[in-house]
Every structure is written in structure tokens, then in C-alpha cells.
Amino acid sequence: MAQQKFLHQRPIQNPFTNPFSSSPLSTSSISNRPISLLSRNGLLLLLALLVILGVFLPWAGSPLFPSPNKLSPSQSKWRDYSLPQAVKFVAKNGTVIVCAVSYPYLPFLNNWLISVSRQKHQDQVLVIAEDYATLYKVNEKWPGHAVLIPPALDSQTAHKFGSQGFFNFTARRPQHLLEILELGYNVMYNDVDMVWLQDPFQYLEGKHDAYFMDDMTAIKPLDHSHDLPPPGKKGRTYICSCMIFLRPTNGAKLLMKKWIEELETQPWSRAKKANDQPGFNWALNKTANQVDMYLLSQAAFPTGGLYFKNKTWVKETKGKHAIIHNNYIVGFEKKIKRFRDFNLWLVDDHASESPLGKLE
């Protein structure tokens, strides 16, 4: 687990375009002579038809490619649902909790939602859907709690860590957060491969601009400093972009703008295979003197490389954990297995506790 402005300037691909429709052909482009299926041209046409059917038919009933003729009135409504409308609907006490989700991540969304519901904060959740299938599924089950900010992404590539699709997916995050700050709301962002064990809001001490958690596995003392840690070997810190809380201050907005700038100057390439986290850390380091920052307690917000790999530390800090992040591991099945091993995969037995219920 940055919305650069150029991402919004790309031509928007309409996922509802019918792949089988075409404009009428002019009579000048069609021969009046009948084509025999046994002729060379006939065989080529037949082969082309079979290829087209083989490619598109398996997707015909897929939720990722809904037909424009099959859109219900409610689905059409959600296509026009805006971020200001959505934030106003879900916000409580001036605060909204957001996550960004593509269709393959729905099981993780549901698992995370169960844990959020147990802390009585589910009504504040806004799912930023990265594809129309997610938008429709969430709003079908939980009306008003999902919004799509165009352009929609390819959900089949957005979840592959290190891919350009994954970069495009994560790179939109600071722009989403900045837009919410500009609307005047506090915002908490979570990756959905997380589980809440306690209410994290009790740890947001003071009135700082930005709160975040360290992604390092080195054990800190329980009374460690809450200042931004010193840079590591790469010249920057190693803060996780998976869990962030921001107040609608000039400092928080400056941090998001700098994050966007960093992602624009360090785009994805086959050589680097970047994600959004290095850009976030450079932004933190470059604005440290202008933004009031707060490093959250390691005991309450441990990285997965510590929580899942150091049993002694987990026992010593028992009862202090607020949010567990299932990182330092790649792959859906591996993440699910690890959650199950630690009794944190809640959807198997507790799906009814999620606002989405059991997802088929």
C-alpha cells in the first residue's frame, strides 16, 4: 500500500462505450460483390470475427465493463456524484476518513470496514473508487459512500505493486487529499490492507498540521520523539504514506502540493518502478520547517515488518496497538494468509459487521 494535474488532463476513456458498435460504413467502402466464406477474403473475415468474439465476449457480463444500455438510474446518478457532495454527506464533526480502492481490493476494503465499524467510525468513511465497478458496487450496498474522480483507472493493473498502473493509482492520492482540505475538512487517509484494533483518533494529540507513522522496523522507545525522524541512507525519511491525518491548514495544504510536485518530477519508469511513498518523504523533508508535523506512536501504529515479525515486541506492547498495517509483503493471497494467521482476516466470520455486508 499523486494526483498530478496532468493525470486529469489525459483524455478520458469512456468505459461504457460499446465495443461492438461502429459508425455506418459508406457504400464506397463496400464492394457490391458477395463474399464467399470459402474464398480467401471470406476466411479472413471469419477469422477476424472469431478473434473479436474471443476477446470481448468473456467481458460482456463483467462488472468492470458495464454496458451503457444496462445502467440503472441509480448508477447514472453515481456517475455524476461529485467529491464536494460526497464529503458533505459522510463528514462528521468536520472530519472524513478516506481510502482509495480498485475492484480487486474490495475484500480488503470489507475487512478494513469491519474493523472501522467496531470503533464506530464507519459513517465517516468515503471510498474513492478508482473504477466504475467499485463505484457502483459500494453505492449499491452503501449509498453515498463512494465517489469516482475521473479519469477512471484500469483496475486490473492498478493493484500490481511496482507497475505503472499501481503508480498511477497511488499518485492520485495527494490531489484527492488536497481537494478535501480545500473544502475545509479534516481528513484521515488509510490503505485498506489495515485493521483497526483501537480508535486511532485518541492518538491525534494537539493541533498539528499533519500526522503520520514511521515505516521502519527498528524498535523505538515507548516515549520516542514525535518529531520527523532524521533522513536515512537515501537522504530522506522512511515515513509510510499508508496512514495520514491532515487538518485543513496552510501547512497541510503546502505538504500536499509539494508531494504532488515531487511525483511530477519523479514519474514512473521501467527502471525505477516508483510509487508515491518516496515523493511523500521528500515532501516531508523539504517542508519540515514550514509544516507542523507529528510522528505517531510506534506502539500504536506499527509497520507490518515489525508487528508480524517480532513476537517479543508484540507481547511487550500488547494492548497499545491501534492500527496494524499488512505491509512488508506482496501479493493478495500472501496478505490474506498472514491476516488469517494473526486472526485479523475478519470477513470470513464477521462480514455482517461491515456496511457492505457479504460481498459475492
Swiss-Prot record:
Membrane topology term: Single-pass type II membrane protein
Sequence motif DXD motif, residues: 191-193
Gene Ontology process terms (BP): pollen tube development; rhamnogalacturonan II biosynthetic process
Phenotype on disruption: Reduced fertility due to impaired growth of pollen tubes in the transmitting tract during fertilization.
Annotated localization: Golgi apparatus membrane
Cofactor: Mn(2+); Mg(2+)
Side Cytoplasmic, residues: 1-41
Region called Disordered, residue ranges: 1-25
Tissue specificity annotation: Widely expressed.
This enzyme's EC code(s): 2.4.2.-
GO cellular component assignments: Golgi apparatus; Golgi membrane; Golgi trans cisterna
Membrane-crossing residue ranges in chain numbering: 42-62
Bias type Low complexity, positions: 14-25
Main location as per UniProt: Golgi
Keywords, comma-separated and alphabetical: Cell wall biogenesis/degradation, Glycoprotein, Glycosyltransferase, Golgi apparatus, Membrane, Signal-anchor, Transferase, Transmembrane, Transmembrane helix
Pfam families in the cross-refs: Nucleotid_trans
Lumenal compartment segments: 63-360
Lineage: superkingdom: Eukaryota
UniProt GO MF annotations: xylosyltransferase activity
Annotated glycosylation sites: 93, 168, 285, 310
Protein's job: Catalyzes the transfer of D-xylose from UDP-alpha-D-xylose onto L-fucose. Probably involved in the biosynthesis of rhamnogalacturonan II (RG-II) through xylosylation of the internal fucose moiety of the A-chain of RG-II, a structurally complex pectic polysaccharide of the primary cell wall. RG-II is essential for the cell wall integrity of rapidly growing tissues such as roots and pollen tube growth and elongation.
UniProt domain comment: The conserved DXD motif is involved in enzyme activity.
Family (UniProt): Belongs to the glycosyltransferase 77 family.
Protein name in the entry: UDP-D-xylose:L-fucose alpha-1,3-D-xylosyltransferase MGP4
Organism of this sequence: Arabidopsis thaliana (Mouse-ear cress)
